[in-house]
Regions:
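Conserved active-site tyrosine of GNAT-family acetyltransferases
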Residues: 20-25, 81, 112, 157-162, ...
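N-terminal beta-strand motif that seeds the catalytic metal site of vicinal oxygen chelate
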Residues: 1-18, 61-66, 122-156, 168-170, ...
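Vicinal oxygen chelate
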Residues: 6-15, 56-152, 184-190, 234-297, ...
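Short, charged/polar, Gly/Pro-enriched secondary-structure boundary elements
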Residues: 47-52, 112-115, 195-199, 260-261
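Short, structured motif recognition centered on aromatic/hydrophobic residues
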Residues: 4-10, 24, 30, 42, ...
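Core segments of cupin and vicinal oxygen chelate
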Residues: 2-49, 149-196
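Conserved donor-binding loop and adjoining core beta-sheet/short helix segment
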Residues: 34-69, 92-94
């Protein structure tokens, strides 16, 4: 079985890199730098980047980068893919250089989401210094945060994530837009770290290629300060401040320049998976998180 350590990075596309530069620095509080082949690195911790932004005609999320522990773990992952008859493509020299890793293998899940398996990230030993004074983001061995991806082919995609990529179920949400409507499934998955979920799948298509990605800060004060910066910069709000029921994250949602949402939160659960029981929860949040504000814009 493949053992993924966490969400190492994501790749997104935008028409003008300066839009992401302003958003990262002025709203998220993350410094940026130039990436090879003309992209933009967005830095969250001691690594050179956690978000790779490239320029293109379409605003969208392009890929999720999943970290493996070693060359041996990467080789084992390729063996698993071959044994399962899963098509993969090894990353080009340009892709490996741009992502700053030792090796890369690309797989596409049954809903069309691109997953990049990688190992051996490059480090420049430069500290994280926020342009907005954010002390730190909660990353480390839990990865950059989480990503929620569209899965219109839900059963096949969930099976792929669990049986091929090695993710395990954290919790289940069956969303009903109205009491008589059929349930829309959203399943939350974890990997080899304590974060409640590093990946989730939602049973519907999303034009931008991602429902949302999440980043976590280490205090509620920093969530509030980011909320103020969002308002000051005129960034579209997607959901009001609230606290989720499943992972207890207190957060708000806003739109990125690539068209998908970003959740900015504090206080997400870190779990001992040997003692965890899967929960089906019946509401998104304990309080707040009014998503109708995003639909009104």
């Amino acid at each position: 079985m493949i053992e993924i350590l966490g969400l190492s990075y994501f790749v997104a596309q935008v028409g003008n890199l300066s839009d992401w530069r302003r958003y990262a620095e002025d709203v998220l509080g993350m410094p940026v730098s130039s990436a090879p082949q003309g992209g933009l690195y967005v830095k969250m911790d001691e690594r050179p980047f956690r978000m790779l932004i490239v320029e293109g005609d379409e605003r969208r999320y392009l890929a999720s980068g999943w970290e493996l522990a070693s060359a041996a773990a990467f080789g084992h992952a390729l063996q698993v893919l071959e044994a399962r008859a899963v098509t993969y493509v090894l990353g080009s020299a340009e892709e490996i250089e741009q992502r700053g890793v030792q090796a890369l293998a690309v797989v596409i899940d049954p809903s069309g989401n691109r997953h990049e398996l990688c190992w051996g990230h490059r480090s420049d030993c430069q500290p994280f210094v926020s342009p907005q004074g954010v002390p730190r983001f909660v990353t480390g061995d839990m990865g950059l945060g989480h990503t929620v991806l569209p899965a219109p082919n839900f059963d096949e995609t969930l099976a792929f994530a669990r049986d091929v990529l090695g993710f395990r179920l954290s919790d289940i949400f069956n969303f009903r837009p109205s009491p008589d409507a059929p349930a829309v499934r959203i399943h939350f998955l974890h990997c080899a770290n304590a974060r409640h979920h590093s990946l989730a799948f939602a049973e519907y298509p999303v034009a931008s290629g991602c429902v949302h990605a999440m980043v976590e800060v280490d205090s509620m004060t920093e969530v509030g300060r980011a909320h103020d910066r969002m308002l000051a910069q005129g960034t579209p709000l997607s959901a009001t401040l609230g606290q989720h029921l499943n992972d207890r994250m207190t957060s708000f949602y806003m739109q990125t320049p690539s068209g998908f949402d970003l959740e900015y939160g504090f206080g997400g659960l870190q779990l001992d998976w040997t003692a965890h029981s899967v929960l089906e929860f019946t509401r998104v949040s304990i309080w707040g998180h009014d998503f109708s504000v995003g639909r009104q814009q």
